[in-house]
């Protein structure tokens, strides 16, 4: 009995992941922080194999760090007139039903959308 209780209380441990807080950024605010493609968007694509595990050159778009901007900087993926309709945002958004594999979390989706709203610069 003592053994069972010991295993029960010591058998499991949890590492809680604190969600990243992303501030709401108004793209029309001239003082709003600029989203950086290199520092903010590329990590979404490559960290932990998020997107680049599949989109690694064998599947379009190629989202490896060195190729990502050239691969998505087309009207097929970025809709500058209606950023929320951009394929690079909408196809992997948390609410999508079209992309069954990995999706953006809400913080990542917000960063991608604001980056597009700010002009989708290669910065």
Where are these regions (language model features)?
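Aromatic- and Gly/Pro-enriched helix-to-coil junctions and flexible linker segments
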Residues: 12-123
